[in-house]
Amino acid sequence: MNQTGLVRSLAAVCLGFTSIVATAQLRHAEPPLHTSGHDILDTAGHRVRLTSVNWYGFDQQDFVAGGLDHAPLATIVKEIVDLGVNSVRLPWANETLEHNPQVPDYAVKANPQFRGRHAMEVMDAVVRALADAHIMVVLDNHVSRADWCCSETDGNGLWYNAEYPESKWLTDWQTIVRRYKSERWVVGADLRNELRNKATWGGTDPKLDWHAASERGGNAVLTANPLLLIMVESPDYSTNFVGFDKLPVRFKIADRLVYSPHAYNIADHPFASYDELKQVYDARAGFLLHTEPGVPLWVGEFGTCQTLDCGANSDWFVMYIRYMKENDLAWSYWAINGTQSSGAGRKYDAIEGYGLLSPDYQHIAAPKLVELLRTIQN
């Protein structure tokens, strides 16, 4: 698709533009949440479609949410509210929780109240600020060792490693869940981010069987807080849910399960048509929308360059927005961050090319991208 075609597609998609007033009405669900068939419901029984942004940092080598070096916490939360989303996926690392290091002064220089504080104290403040704004939070166990994700060799490809064995993974989940148990706006636990190709769904090797591990992890979380949604990703970077219908996840509390596919066009694959894209994504995860008993889907990550001028990647994104709209999918955009955190292959404070916010975290950096996202907020 050339740039003219992209503009035409943008115009077509934006016919479904939802006003901020309408999205505000959707935003104020009443937690805690539960599931019924393919839907997520609030305490009043109203359907809730999670429309979210990822706000990374507690999973990175600076051990703190991105942007606190550029803008007050309240300013960043207001920007999230103004986007019209109703939730935040908040990545964290086992290292951050277990070691709870003192955050570096440079990473919180716009928030002097956090100087000398420890990482989990800052996370407490972030969760509290989001909750005060009635923004729901999904805690995401992104990595074991704090670093940028993801590769096959980064030591974070399974739900455990030598330094952070499964026993710690389970204990850490219970620790962080209990920490926020009294905060009803913390509504979900994304058990583990992007299991790599080595992980299996079932099989004979318990060290690789993510299906069995996800049941152990989910039940551990529900023991600590039975009111949380449990998000389960798939092997192959959470892009392939083949077999989930034949070997479903079963928790001790039945109405808590959500499957969470991820979607990127990393290889800049030039889809020839929307029908081709639809066929690919139906085969990867979309088929679960038509299986019984139903399980809700929440696209926990998807994204593109903020300028929407990156060729096949942008063309893919416009078509994928259409796919999500046609399937009424819940979602979480990667990412809200305007700048990069420290990590492998990253440069601290460099512009985040997929980010929705400006590098000063005080205005939208990607207005066309935000317009597209607003078409799938209702």
Which residues does each PLM region occupy?
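Active-site mouth of glycoside hydrolases
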Residues: 28-246, 360, 364, 368
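Boundary at the C-terminal end of the N-terminal hydrophobic targeting segment
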Residues: 22-24
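Bacterial N-terminal signal peptides that target proteins for export
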Residues: 1-10
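Aromatic-rich peripheral "rim/lid" segments of glycoside hydrolase catalytic domains that contact
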Residues: 309-378
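Glycoside hydrolase catalytic-domain groove-lining segments
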Residues: 207-307, 319, 325, 329
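Short, hinge-like loop/turn segments at secondary-structure boundaries
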Residues: 106-108, 155-158, 247-251, 317, ...
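Glycan-binding loop/region signatures in secreted carbohydrate-active enzymes
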Residues: 54-57, 64, 254, 258-260, ...
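Bacterial N-terminal signal peptides
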Residues: 9-19
